[in-house]
């Protein structure tokens, strides 16, 4: 069966793995998922990630991060979805928890955080919120 929203599936796998204290989580890989994992690593929400498997069926393995026995990611939720795309201009990109969290935005210059998008003066599709 085909997956209608692979990004929501990625976020759900991360959320579920952290609820049962898993150290790693595996999922099918794509360029967009790798870009999101890169942003999560740069922002300190995950320890690392690695693309494994064959060229025909690559798999993304994410190593989750915990602090004092609790997951670093407290909240991770999908914003724009296939049935309702959410686009924001450069001046309307939302802040998550007054800047304590990040919104991951897909722009014409690549996938980046809300702060970086505002600094570069670009808007785009708001993929998810992470706090």
Swiss-Prot record:
GO terms for molecular function: rRNA binding; structural constituent of ribosome. SUPFAM superfamilies: Ribosomal protein S8. Belongs to the universal ribosomal protein uS8 family. The keyword Thylakoid does not apply. GO terms for cellular component: ribonucleoprotein complex; ribosome. The keyword Amino-acid biosynthesis does not apply. Part of the 30S ribosomal subunit. Contacts proteins S5 and S12. This is Small ribosomal subunit protein uS8. NCBIfam families: PRK00136.1. The gene is rpsH. One of the primary rRNA binding proteins, it binds directly to 16S rRNA central domain where it helps coordinate assembly of the platform of the 30S subunit. It comes from the Bacteria. Keywords: Ribonucleoprotein, Ribosomal protein, RNA-binding, rRNA-binding. One of its GO terms (biological process) is translation.
């Amino acid at each position: 069966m085909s997956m209608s929203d692979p990004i929501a599936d990625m976020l759900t796998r991360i959320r579920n793995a952290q609820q049962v204290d898993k150290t790693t989580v595996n999922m099918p890989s794509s360029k967009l998922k790798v870009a999101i994992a890169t942003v999560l690593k740069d922002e300190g929400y995950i320890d690392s990630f690695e693309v494994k498997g064959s060229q025909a069926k690559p798999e993304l393995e994410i190593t989750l991060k915990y602090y004092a026995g609790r997951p670093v990611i407290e909240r991770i939720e999908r914003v724009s979805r296939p049935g309702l795309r959410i686009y924001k201009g450069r001046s309307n990109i939302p802040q998550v928890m007054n800047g304590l969290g990040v919104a991951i935005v897909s722009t014409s210059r690549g996938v980046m955080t809300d702060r970086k998008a505002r600094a570069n003066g670009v808007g785009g599709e708001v993929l998810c919120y992470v706090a």
